[in-house]
C-alpha cells in the first residue's frame, strides 16, 4: 500500500533542479552570486542522476563519481566566493558588467 519511490522520481527531481539552474543562469545575468548558485543547482542535479542510476544498476561507480563531483563543486564554490570577495573589496561591486570590464 506504500508508495514506492522509483528511478523516475529521482530523474524528475533532477530534471526540475537542472531546469531551475539553467533558467537562473539565463534569466539573471546581472548578479554573479545567483549565477554561481545556479551552477551549483546544475551540479546537484547531475549528482542526483549519478547516484540514482548507480543505485538502480547496483554499481557503486556512480556514487564514487558523485562524491568526486561534490568535492570539485565545493572547491569551485569556495574559490569563486573568494574571488568575488576580493573583487568587491577592490571595485565595490560584483555586477557582471564590472567583471566583464576586467577582460584584457
UniProtKB/Swiss-Prot annotation:
Q: Name one GO cellular component term.
A: plasma membrane
What are the subcellular locations of this protein? Cell inner membrane
- Enzyme class, first EC level, given as a word: translocase
What membrane topology does the annotation report for this chain? Multi-pass membrane protein
Q: Tell me which Pfam families the record gives.
A: Oxidored_q2
For this UniProt record, the keywords arranged alphabetically read as follows: Cell inner membrane, Cell membrane, Membrane, NAD, Quinone, Translocase, Transmembrane, Transmembrane helix, Transport, Ubiquinone
User: What would be an example GO MF term here?
Assistant: quinone binding
Reaction catalysis annotation: a quinone + NADH + 5 H(+)(in) = a quinol + NAD(+) + 4 H(+)(out)
**Subunit structure, per the record?**
NDH-1 is composed of 14 different subunits. Subunits NuoA, H, J, K, L, M, N constitute the membrane sector of the complex.
Q: What does this protein do?
A: NDH-1 shuttles electrons from NADH, via FMN and iron-sulfur (Fe-S) centers, to quinones in the respiratory chain. The immediate electron acceptor for the enzyme in this species is believed to be ubiquinone. Couples the redox reaction to proton translocation (for every two electrons transferred, four hydrogen ions are translocated across the cytoplasmic membrane), and thus conserves the redox energy in a proton gradient.
Write down what this protein is called: NADH-quinone oxidoreductase subunit K
Amino acid at each position: 500500500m506504500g508508495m514506492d519511490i522509483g528511478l523516475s522520481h529521482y530523474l524528475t527531481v533532477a530534471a526540475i533542479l537542472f531546469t531551475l539552474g539553467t533558467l537562473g543562469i539565463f534569466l539573471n545575468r546581472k548578479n554573479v552570486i545567483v549565477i554561481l548558485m545556479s551552477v551549483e543547482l546544475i551540479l546537484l542535479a547531475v549528482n542526483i542522476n549519478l547516484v540514482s542510476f548507480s543505485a538502480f544498476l547496483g554499481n557503486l561507480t556512480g556514487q564514487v563519481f558523485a562524491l568526486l563531483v561534490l568535492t570539485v563543486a565545493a572547491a569551485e564554490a569556495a574559490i569563486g566566493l573568494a574571488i568575488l570577495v576580493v573583487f568587491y573589496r577592490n571595485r565595490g561591486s560584483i555586477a557582471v558588467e564590472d567583471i566583464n570590464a576586467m577582460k584584457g
